[in-house]
Amino acid sequence: MKTLIILKDLTKVFDNQLILRGINLEIKQNEFVTLLGPSGCGKTTILRILGGFENPSSGEVLFQGKSILNVAAHKRPINTVFQKYALFPHLNVFENVAFGLRLKDFNSKIKDNLDINETHYKTSKANLSKTFHQELTKDLAQEKTTQITNNFNNQIEALTKDFEAKQTALKCKKINKKEQEEQIQKEVLKYIKIMGLQGLEKRTIEQLSGGQQQRVAIARALINKPQVLLLDEPLSNLDLKLKQEMQYELKEIQKNSGITFLFVTHDQEEAFTMSDKVVVMNNGEIQQIGSPEDIYNEPANRFVAQFVGESNLIKGVMKDDFLVHFDNQTFNCVDKGFRKEENVDIVIRPEDIDIVYQGKGLITGIVQSIIFKGVHWEIDVKTAQRTYIIHTTDHVELNKKIDITFNPEDIHVMEIW
């Protein structure tokens, strides 16, 4: 996939407070990218800068290799769906979706081509005139002058005929108001069908549910066929079931439309369900960029491990390649490249720990609490050094003495930032 957007050394200062600290990010064409992080981490600020609603304090925003910082928001090939949708309460569903098309000049490309043709015609005519005068200056003989003049007039006549024919053909392609309205009707009904809003065309915004309002906002944003769609936590006001349905719908829309989506959320499930690439942020800085699988299975640091899913976070010491020491024991692992005796952070996911009979595992502990979570049990096991959180489908007795075990690949070693 081609790179569509590049953010280079982006910073933003609000009221003497540094909100963005040197953001560097590449977004590819037809990619679903999610900015994931806690409130105030700077993710919405990035969205607003891309959309043209804010300017960075320093840095560059490149779109297809060209800076767009001086391009007005409405002229960028980017549309935004805001958290509160920003729908027009005085317009019905149909007119909300049609709003962008009604502002659009359907003949703009034809007008541009007419201007291009005219410029080309004038330039060619001027070049012919220049050549004509140069030839006259070289040869002032009567017969030659007449021949040069006739040749010039013939070229000008041919050039003019070609220009007028092209202009006439382009003008014939212009559409009138009736044809424009027919196109609007066709496009609006198409996107209303895509978003599952058939039968609601004449309803006011107040008569819609939260999920329906969100669909209207997305249809309105998509109908102008932007190259990029920015979504600022659009699912935050929906109930759980509807939110899950919309996650799958959004991914399908993105995949089928070929539009690049940049989605902002603090919800890990949203990010992992929909994204090709997740950008984890904290305190105005990018902590890690990767696929949902990479972010979850190989967190770059303690913050990512804590923010993305539940974790057992442990401080340890790297003894050698593939050997790490924690909880008074040395364990085999799959990590290498650290200095000997380097202090490290370790994460072991709750689902990667198994409970076994005493004497059969790596660490002994006592079952301290058991909570049923629907698809698994969440069990706290207190050991001599710490309490481990374990997710398992096997039920164990409270206060029972057991062992826990895990594999070398389940131990994720991280640098301390």
Swiss-Prot record:
It is a peripheral membrane protein. ATP binds at G37, P38, S39, G40, C41, G42, K43, T44. InterPro entries: AAA+_ATPase, ABC_SmlMolc_Importer, ABC_transporter-like_ATP-bd, ABC_transporter-like_CS, Mo/tungstate-bd_C_term_dom, NA-bd_OB-fold, P-loop_NTPase, Transp-assoc_OB_typ2. Its EC number is 7.6.2.11. Residues 5-308 form the ABC transporter domain. It comes from the Bacteria. Residues 105-177 are annotated as: Insert. It is an enzyme of class 7 (translocase). Keywords: ATP-binding, Cell membrane, Membrane, Nucleotide-binding, Translocase, Transport. It holds the Pfam family TOBE_2. It catalyses: ATP + H2O + polyamine-[polyamine-binding protein]Side 1 = ADP + phosphate + polyamineSide 2 + [polyamine-binding protein]Side 1. PROSITE patterns: ABC_TRANSPORTER_1 (PS00211), ABC_TRANSPORTER_2 (PS50893), POTA (PS51305). One of its GO terms (molecular function) is ABC-type polyamine transporter activity. It is found in: Cell membrane. One of its GO terms (cellular component) is ATP-binding cassette (ABC) transporter complex. Transmembrane segments: none annotated. Belongs to the ABC transporter superfamily. Spermidine/putrescine importer (TC 3.A.1.11.1) family. Part of the ABC transporter complex PotABCD involved in spermidine/putrescine import. Responsible for energy coupling to the transport system. PANTHER family: SPERMIDINE/PUTRESCINE IMPORT ATP-BINDING PROTEIN POTA (PTHR42781), SPERMIDINE_PUTRESCINE IMPORT ATP-BINDING PROTEIN POTA (PTHR42781:SF4). The complex is composed of two ATP-binding proteins (PotA), two transmembrane proteins (PotB and PotC) and a solute-binding protein (PotD). This is Spermidine/putrescine import ATP-binding protein PotA. It comes from Aster yellows witches'-broom phytoplasma (strain AYWB).
